[in-house]
Amino acid sequence: MSTKFIFVTGGVVSSLGKGIAAASLAAILEARGLNVTILKLDPYINVDPGTMSPIQHGEVYVTEDGAETDLDLGHYERFIRTKMTSRNNFTQGRVYKDVLHRERRGEYLGATIQVIPHITNDIKQRVYSGAEGYDIALVEIGGTVGDIESQPFLEAIRQMGTEIGRERALFIHLTLVPFLGPAGEVKTKPTQHSVKELRSIGIQPDILICRSDRKLPSNERAKIALFTNVEEKAVISLPDVDSIYKIPALLKSQDLDYFVCRRFHLDVPEADLVEWEQVLYQESNPTGEVTIGMVGKYIELPDAYKSVNEALKHAGLKNRLTVNIQYIDSQDLETKGVDSLAHLDAILVPGGFGGRGVEGKILAAKYARENKVPYLGICLGMQVALIEYARNVAGLVDANSTEFNAQSASPVVGLITEWLDAEGKVEQRDEKSDLGGTMRLGAQKCHLTPGSKVHAVYGSDEIVERHRHRYEVNNNFVEQLEKAGLSFTGLSEDKKLVEIIENKDHPWFIAAQFHPEFTSTPRDGHPLFEGFVAAAHIHQKASS
């Protein structure tokens, strides 16, 4: 059948949870047997989020095909089985860049390039292309209705609604209905004005999802329906909940999926949410708890480590444990010492870039090694564990990464200096190269050493994990580090690059160059995080 489109916009304020709402609806539709995908359209001018500050933008989520994308794509993959690709996320900057590139090549035959039709046509083509082959495509428009940056995207989806007709296009508007304490009531006026703004550009929402800190009374839903020209049963109340994984059931209880299927004339089975019921059961019935310290430098914005946070929670579900995450600024370890690590059941050092706070991360790895505390290093977290071991065990006292000290006499971690590009040509990469689009990215195979801890964790000889990094373990130091007792138990497909290290004299000390957090889901978990949380619980019991 022809793809049906559900366009999701937001109003009043940003960060209302459009991505979670879209992903939750997608999960219900998928549970009805439909083939579903989700696209995210970002209005900012950056070509992609790859070089944006994690403190401003949150984490950069990496897809299987190596696209650096918005963190909402992580939500999408955690809620539905469909794997996201580079087609599932694009920015206004990417659109303008490509349109201007075609203009320079003369592809517009000298025409004056305008937002309408050239920019909007490019947006529409990307949406159609990204949705191809699916029963339903949800399209989330970043930002808020009324933002200048969002106007080309809103115009594009307005045109799409006209082109494909009401039987294939449905508009959902997510809005805020605040509760005013002194007045003792919810206020619908912001929602009314937000819908008025949306209608002024030619889009009439079919469904309103109203965010509030409480369930909306039926009389307020009726009032909103009256003033926004939306069916009363299509005004959905979405109150705050203590777990985002409750939202699919919450939306289903208000027949949101039924409304969508009726609108699209879809005769499909009822949604079976038994997998989500199992997730909620595991979440609400823990048998214990562990405290894991996450040592990083972007801790003022937890969304900078969004997928790691979620992966730890998923591992807690599989172990029937509540995972309490304590964020520790790595710079504090440099200035105040490591006493803040003493009460932890495990230590995790996630990825990152730049030299700020690196010595604190090295101290965290040293503390975990010396005190037999379970340690999981991810990307930079592996590199600092390697540097620490080289300095304090292998005798390479000046060991470092060339990212932090280009003149190090023992550069145990170094820049990727050449590889093949997509056309099979050799490219040179050094410290003078552009930062954007110059990394080892996406899903790659890794061979595991039989008999190693990580082999036992995965239960497989070969795995596929996603990468996002420029620097690698320097193979010139591998033999010396192995003689000092460090184990290199995961190698790239061609056996030339180190992917995983282990400390064989430690109960659980594993560090990986890749990012396992990107493939963890609440329904399936991830073996590396599950093993890590289980080790934290064992350490807790042994220490008590």
From Swiss-Prot:
InterPro entries found in the cross-reference section: Class_I_gatase-like (IPR029062), CTP_synthase (IPR004468), CTP_synthase_N (IPR017456), GATASE (IPR017926), GATase1_CTP_Synthase (IPR033828), P-loop_NTPase (IPR027417)
Identification of the protein by name: CTP synthase
Note: CTPSs have evolved a hybrid strategy for distinguishing between UTP and CTP. The overlapping regions of the product feedback inhibitory and substrate sites recognize a common feature in both compounds, the triphosphate moiety. To differentiate isosteric substrate and product pyrimidine rings, an additional pocket far from the expected kinase/ligase catalytic site, specifically recognizes the cytosine and ribose portions of the product inhibitor.
GO MF annotations in UniProt: ATP binding; CTP synthase activity; glutaminase activity; identical protein binding; metal ion binding
GO biological process terms on file: 'de novo' CTP biosynthetic process; pyrimidine nucleobase biosynthetic process
Functional pathway: Pyrimidine metabolism; CTP biosynthesis via de novo pathway; CTP from UDP: step 2/2
Top-level class of the enzyme under EC nomenclature: ligase
Catalytic residues, chain numbering: 379 (nucleophile), 515, 517
Task of the protein: Catalyzes the ATP-dependent amination of UTP to CTP with either L-glutamine or ammonia as the source of nitrogen. Regulates intracellular CTP levels through interactions with the four ribonucleotide triphosphates.
GO terms for cellular component: cytosol
Span list, region Amidoligase domain: 1-266
UniProt activity-regulation remark: Allosterically activated by GTP, when glutamine is the substrate; GTP has no effect on the reaction when ammonia is the substrate. The allosteric effector GTP functions by stabilizing the protein conformation that binds the tetrahedral intermediate(s) formed during glutamine hydrolysis. Inhibited by the product CTP, via allosteric rather than competitive inhibition.
Protein family per UniProt: Belongs to the CTP synthase family.
Start and end residues of each Glutamine amidotransferase type-1 domain: 291-542
The enzyme's E.C. designation: 6.3.4.2
Annotated CTP binding sites: 14, 147-149, 187-192, 223
Residues bound to ATP: 15-20, 72
Subunit structure and binding partners: Homotetramer.
Key words of the record: ATP-binding, Glutamine amidotransferase, Ligase, Magnesium, Metal-binding, Nucleotide-binding, Pyrimidine biosynthesis
Residues binding L-glutamine, per UniProt: 352, 380-383, 403, 470
Catalytic activity line of the entry: UTP + L-glutamine + ATP + H2O = CTP + L-glutamate + ADP + phosphate + 2 H(+); L-glutamine + H2O = L-glutamate + NH4(+); UTP + NH4(+) + ATP = CTP + ADP + phosphate + 2 H(+)
Binding site residues for UTP: 14, 187-192, 223
Pfam families xref list: CTP_synth_N, GATase
Residues at which Mg(2+) binds: 72, 140
